[in-house]
């Protein structure tokens, strides 16, 4: 590897020396051609309005008079570029493209054999070979490479292999003076596309295309711009113009459109005045904001309507605490909300209702369910129990004073049991003591019934038994009061009398039987599973309630 690099380095040095000699020759020729510049300027002025002004014309190869201008501008740049040696690592790349261009471009030399074309060919060869050298020197001389391409191309083309192409490069630079604006626009695209042009220079047809783009990118174009491009010699090379135009047209849209996209929004041409721009901005912004606000408002209004529709039934109390006078109103709102929503089971419905009770009402709600387990599965009974419990708020003050002041009196057993259970939660008393205290304050009629049964050691069992006995007593009264219905010939009432007689003569359960039914979750009244004694269908008051419900419907 090192030997190859050293050999390539030596060859490049020799080539640089040859180029220097060629540069001197070209400088002498430039001096001779400078005398012809005024004549060429006149002819170029005539052709300024012709279609050859395109950047492709600047890239046209055969124009002998352009060499002097290019040489003059390139003279200061060429000697330092040629003198500077390229690194061995960089030498490999230039050798290959230079060799390729040398081998591929001899046929082009045959076509234009004129002396000026040879000068231009020197430039083209210099372009191809020196491209390799500047690529070698890319890190050291990236800015100088642009300036040195012109001078190196002039000598290289004469001796190397691309005399016609050198004419193109020289011819392009001087005519660029007249087309300064067009060339400046083209400079951006070819300058950035130099790496793309270098590989194209190796191909026979594309060599001219890549070289003119490189020559346009060099700053020498602006300095050497002169009307020499319009000489009649350009007609011979005008055939190559379409090729240059194709390459330039293909390369320009790649680079120019992105800057145009960025410039259009930044520099709007319509609002030139600052006042116009401000008015334009003020008008555009509020329009968008108004549309956004309208959409946002309509969306929020719809959302609010939906929320109001869902929360409307619970406007007044989201949670029922201590204002017991509003219980009926709260229950109406709650039932209307639950009907629209619906729940799969009664137990889920009851648990949901319990979430609305807080404060003192919440403290009494759970004992109510504990004292009467059937309420957990029947929502209608729960509502009646709530009304019975919270219908007399003055009794809460008595309940807060303690168990001694709590009496059932003429009230219902569920209400008394609920308040007793609420107070018992705050006392550290045993189950047996609570059972005794509960039974002592019951109504006399219920106490007589309980005395016939075995004593219970669980407060919940005592409460259930007490409620059951009270329901039995109320059921007997209801059955007697409904005797008028029995006389009307309804079949239901005679069947109801049988359980009533059975209940009056029904013996009390033993403690063992009662324990067995509790363990097996059986009804304490009929002994069948699936319901509690309060909901037993065998009871006469249950049959009467079913008849009343049908009558209401």
From Swiss-Prot:
UniProt-listed Pfam families: DUF4939, zf-CCHC
Ranges annotated as biased composition (Polar residues): 118-127, 239-250, 495-507
Gene3D superfamilies in alphabetical order: Zinc finger, CCHC-type
Location(s) in or outside the cell: Nucleus
Region (Disordered), start-end ranges: 38-274, 474-514
Keyword Zinc-finger: yes
Keywords of this entry: Coiled coil, Metal-binding, Nucleus, Zinc, Zinc-finger
Coiled coil location: 2-43
SMART domains assigned: ZnF_C2HC
Ranges of compositional bias, category Basic and acidic residues: 45-57, 87-113, 132-147
An MF annotation (GO) of this entry: nucleic acid binding
GO cellular component: nucleus
InterPro entries: DUF4939 (IPR032549), RTL1-rel (IPR032567), Znf_CCHC (IPR001878), Znf_CCHC_sf (IPR036875)
Compositional bias of kind Low complexity: 58-73, 474-483
Tissue: Expressed in embryonic myogenic progenitor cells, not expressed in adult and aged satellite cells.
Tagged with keyword Metal-binding: yes
Zinc finger annotations (CCHC-type) as residue ranges: 523-537
Something else known: RTL3 is one of at least 11 genes called Mar or Mart related to long terminal repeat retrotransposons. They do not correspond to functional retrotransposons, but rather to neofunctionalized retrotransposons genes.
PANTHER family given in the database record: LDOC1 RELATED, RETROTRANSPOSON GAG-LIKE PROTEIN 3
Known function: May function as a transcriptional regulator. Plays a role in postnatal myogenesis, may be involved in the regulation of satellite cells self-renewal.
Name assigned to this protein: Retrotransposon Gag-like protein 3
């Amino acid at each position: 590897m090192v030997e190859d690099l050293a050999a390539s380095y030596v060859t490049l040095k020799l080539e640089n020396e040859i180029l220097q000699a060629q540069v001197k020759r070209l400088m002498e020729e430039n001096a001779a051609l400078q005398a012809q510049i005024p004549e060429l300027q006149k002819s170029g002025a005539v052709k300024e309005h012709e279609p050859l002004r395109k950047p492709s014309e600047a890239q046209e190869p055969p124009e002998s008079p352009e060499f002097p201008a290019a040489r003059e501008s390139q003279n200061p740049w060429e000697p330092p570029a040629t003198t500077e040696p390229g690194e061995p690592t960089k030498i490999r790349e230039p050798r290959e493209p230079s060799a390729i261009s040398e081998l591929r471009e001899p046929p082009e030399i045959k076509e234009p054999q004129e002396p000026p074309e040879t000068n231009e060919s020197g430039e083209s060869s210099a372009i191809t070979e020196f491209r390799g050298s500047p690529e070698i020197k890319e890190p050291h001389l990236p800015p100088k490479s642009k300036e040195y391409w012109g001078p190196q191309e002039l000598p290289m083309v004469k001796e190397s292999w691309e005399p016609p192409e050198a004419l193109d490069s020289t011819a392009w630079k001087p005519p660029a003076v007249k087309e300064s604006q067009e060339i400046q626009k083209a400079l951006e695209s070819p300058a950035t596309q130099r790496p793309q042009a270098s590989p194209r220079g190796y191909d026979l047809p594309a060599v001219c295309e890549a070289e003119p783009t490189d020559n346009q990118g060099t700053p020498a174009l602006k300095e050497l711009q002169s009307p020499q491009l319009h000489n009649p010699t350009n007609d011979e090379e005008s055939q190559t113009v379409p090729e240059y135009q194709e390459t330039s047209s293909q390369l320009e849209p790649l680079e120019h459109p992105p800057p145009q996209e960025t410039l259009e929004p930044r520099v709007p041409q319509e609002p030139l005045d600052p006042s116009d721009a401000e008015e334009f901005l003020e008008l555009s912004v509020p329009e968008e904001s108004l549309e956004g606000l309208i959409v946002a408002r309509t969306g929020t209004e719809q959302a609010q309507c939906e929320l109001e529709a869902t929360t409307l039934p619970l406007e007044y109390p989201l949670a029922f605490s201590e204002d017991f006078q509003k219980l009926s109103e709260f229950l109406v709102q709650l039932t209307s909300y639950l009907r629209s929503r619906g729940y799969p089971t009664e137990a889920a419905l009851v648990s949901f209702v319990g979430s609305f009770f807080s404060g003192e009402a919440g403290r009494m709600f759970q004992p109510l369910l504990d004292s009467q387990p059937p309420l957990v599965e029947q929502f209608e009974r729960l509502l009646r129990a709530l009304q019975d419990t919270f219908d007399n708020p003055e009794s809460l003050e008595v309940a807060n004073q303690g168990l001694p002041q709590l009496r059932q009196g003429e009230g219902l057993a569920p209400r008394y049991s609920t308040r007793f259970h609420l107070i018992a939660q705050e006392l550290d008393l045993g189950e047996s003591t609570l059972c005794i205290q509960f039974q002592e304050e019951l109504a006399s009629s219920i106490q007589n019934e309980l005395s016939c049964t075995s004593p219970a050691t669980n407060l919940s069992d005592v409460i259930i038994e007490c409620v059951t006995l009270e329901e039995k007593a109320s059921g007997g009264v209801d059955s007697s009061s409904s005797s008028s219905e029995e006389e009307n010939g309804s079949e239901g009432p005679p069947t109801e009398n049988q359980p009533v007689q059975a209940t009056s003569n029904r013996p009390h359960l033993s403690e063992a039987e009662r324990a067995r039914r509790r363990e097996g979750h059986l009804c304490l009244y009929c002994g069948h599973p699936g319901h509690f004694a309060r909901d037993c269908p065998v009871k006469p008051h249950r049959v009467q309630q079913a008849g009343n419900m049908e009558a209401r419907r």
